[in-house]
Amino acid sequence: MDEEYDVIVLGTGLTECILSGIMSVNGKKVLHMDRNPYYGGESSSITPLEELYKRFQLLEGPPESMGRGRDWNVDLIPKFLMANGQLVKMLLYTEVTRYLDFKVVEGSFVYKGGKIYKVPSTETEALASNLMGMFEKRRFRKFLVFVANFDENDPKTFEGVDPQTTSMRDVYRKFDLGQDVIDFTGHALALYRTDDYLDQPCLETINRIKLYSESLARYGKSPYLYPLYGLGELPQGFARLSAIYGGTYMLNKPVDDIIMENGKVVGVKSEGEVARCKQLICDPSYIPDRVRKAGQVIRIICILSHPIKNTNDANSCQIIIPQNQVNRKSDIYVCMISYAHNVAAQGKYIAIASTTVETTDPEKEVEPALELLEPIDQKFVAISDLYEPIDDGCESQVFCSCSYDATTHFETTCNDIKDIYKRMAGTAFDFENMKRKQNDVFGEAEQ
């Protein structure tokens, strides 16, 4: 271990593993360490089921009705991949897809007035949806056509909207859309967690709705993908990429000290040895004095013996409860997967409800989601602090990732990865640099 590296990475969460893979592909000499004996850090999948019970101090362990413990892989952080999103691009460009198998998530639903409805995102679905009345449907259809045709480089498609200055609130007004439609457009299509976006320039929202529609168009049932055997497969896939390009991995390796000289990182001390480096990447747990708390997320893992009601017996789905529907500032999310994804015993389902904490009674905040899941066989409640770095790391060359937020997709994580890359390399992250061969997620060559 007494060696000189370009980059040392501490923690094997998804953000760290992707950056480690990218740096190795770029020819950097990388040492990657984790104090845990398993991959994934905060974003790991726990197996066997007995481990999950232990982790949550449920000492009696799982009952026999839960089946074989090793048939379970339970994600600690529930997220899906947008089929056309940034993480899928990273997987394709690096060919990490060869280590993973994906399934399309069967449905995307939105909550309104105590019931759940399928999210309409095409013209045909919008016209058939019970979410809106007839006239509302026509207006919404017009809006979707406008978004689909919108091209920020072609003013002819603007229809009087300025992408840089017109607010999204004004765009909704232009199409005369009602509050319910605005709710599900902003939260179930554009996937915002709060309503802060309404007064921002509309371009980002339009692009987010496009991403949703393009992701949906790709594979049909929903815009989301999920890997067989759980999300813990993702960091491991990028770790393999790093190893192929000469990266060194050490699990179960305690970190005693991060060594600084004149305010710059020069190495990491572990078990009496020092590995030297020019740059350091880590998650917040390795540098508590260089991060600040930015909020909390509650995640409740629920094991069920039945599909969720009114989802057409889907074996996987996402439900978004827009904040307006339950008098909150932040949305509540449910991600559900099952035995069909090799993450649970036969006939069992895992639904994870999560939201940004707003009160002193977080469990009560998630109640509207839990009501949709009844009866629940077993609950595991986790309340996590969210951390972010206090500086950009350019001076110290210590680059810290942000905690995983309450969103149910990886777009914010990818933004963090691109941001850290830019600060480390001094140039913007370019997917083209990582290109090995262009196939789609299911291994078929692109047309």
Curated annotation (Swiss-Prot):
InterPro entries: FAD/NAD-bd_sf, GDP_dissociation_inhibitor, RabGDI. Transmembrane segments: none annotated. It comes from the Eukaryota. Coiled coil: none annotated. GO terms for molecular function: GTPase activator activity; Rab GDP-dissociation inhibitor activity. GO terms for biological process: negative regulation of axonogenesis; negative regulation of protein targeting to membrane; protein transport; Rab protein signal transduction; vesicle-mediated transport. Gene3D superfamilies: FAD/NAD(P)-binding domain, Guanine Nucleotide Dissociation Inhibitor, domain 1, Guanine Nucleotide Dissociation Inhibitor, domain 2. It is found in: Cytoplasm; Golgi apparatus, trans-Golgi network. GO terms for cellular component: Golgi apparatus. Interacts with RHOH. Interacts with the non-phosphorylated forms of RAB1A, RAB3A, RAB5A, RAB5B, RAB5C, RAB8A, RAB8B, RAB10, RAB12, RAB35, and RAB43. This is Rab GDP dissociation inhibitor alpha. The lineage of its organism: Eukaryota, Metazoa, Chordata, Craniata, Vertebrata.
